[in-house]
Amino acid sequence: MEQKFKTDSMNEDRISDLPDALLLQILSSLPTENAIATSVLSKRWRSLWTMLPKLKFDSNFNPVFDDDNIDPTMFSENVYKTLSLHKAPVLESLHLSFEGRTDCLHVGIWIATAFARGVRKLVLDSFYQEDQTVTLPSVLFSYNDSLEILKLKCAIDLDFPSRVCLKSLRKLYLDQVHFKDEESVCNLLCGCPSLQDLVVHRYSNADVATFTIASPSLQRLTIEDLRQEGGYGNGSYVINAPGLKYLNINGVIDIESCLIDKALELEEAKISNVSGITNENILESLTSAKRLILHLSPLEVKVPTGKIFDQLGCLELLTHEREWWNLLSIMLDSSPKLQILKLTDVYLHDNKTNPDERKWNPPKCAPECLLFHLETFLWIGYEWQRGDEKEVATYILENARRLKKATFSTKRIGREKLEDFEKRREMLNELAIVLWDSNSCHLVFEST
């Protein structure tokens, strides 16, 4: 018994003798409630948790109450008590997950206390409870110079009658939050002079018909608008961000317009699942892009003509979209300096239309990019059995005079299909013959 006591004491001493930095790193990996519970282990641990740089609370996992009987008031008191006892020089982040029925006064106290502690990252995740939402007190955002990252999610109402002032905010995430009106959107974004990264997730435009994003400092923008059935279809987006470098738009469907002012510094744009935009040509706004990733059909959006993508060096298209090959022809003609072309089938051939319904009409004259600039051609999910895909591949190999490397990735063939092995080998030989006159191009075939 005495020997066991000595062993336990030695183990305790070993842990207690660890540097504070290492102990705090260990505690930071735990939920804040569990980290606080370690204070009973020994005198060494009693106040260690108060120096944690990151705090995270989730009312769903409150150890005092079960999931069916969560007491919002008790949860609020625990959060406030923890914040009031916090002694770390800097509060790096505060993550709060709570019910939509939580008292707005309590939420305001949390935010005010965190701001007073100089919090750099604030995450507010309010989950719906009986369709109730939390309205954030706008006065708390009237001035703050420490917050760098703000994430707001779900059952949160935003009403900003006047401009906020978040001087140091660099990243803003708006995930299914509800704005009172268009003015509230403007007052929030215009009050973030250092904003560089904005992510907007919406499932309906019931709150704001015209969602305007105006920010001269913005460099990265992601819009995901996967509106649910029965949502409004007459809204619009207006993007005024002259310094924008990276743009990602996904799911903007059946709206009146998506107007993007000329983004002259645009490096990369990805446009996915966009259709039914009635008034504006979204692609015409991307003419300065150096890299384009287009996951859309030319049947669903207006496609510009002319050599307007004169800075485009890399283009990626999805080959499962309807009449994708027509979009390819247009983009080849419109991109005189294209150097890299990537075709991808993300569905691994399972979602392609009947070959009898597909017909590719190649450009009448070889595009300038093929004759003078294209160096890399990659086709992932190349379906060698289809005549139309063979036509596209052959056309590019025949006309790309400066091509250095062409890679075709095909679906792996099972050993039981020996006949398909032979047919694929013949196809590969035919493509290789096309390149015999070009000793500089390296042809690669892969199976996935």
From Swiss-Prot:
Respond yes or no to whether keyword ATP-binding is given for this record: no
Residue span(s) of domain FBD: 359-410
LRR repeats span which residues? 72-98, 149-176, 177-202, 204-225, 226-251, 271-296, 319-345
Q: Which domain of life is it from?
A: Eukaryota
Q: Which InterPro entries match?
A: F-box-like_dom_sf, F-box_AtFBL13-like, F-box_dom, FBD, FBL13/AtMIF1-like, LRR_dom_sf, LRR_FXL15/At3g58940/PEG3-like
Q: Which PROSITE patterns match?
A: FBOX (PS50181)
Could you list this entry's UniProt keywords, alphabetically sorted: Leucine-rich repeat, Repeat
Q: What is this protein called?
A: F-box/FBD/LRR-repeat protein At2g04230
Among CDD domains, the record links this protein to:
F-box_AtFBL13-like (cd22160)
Q: Where is the F-box domain?
A: 12-64
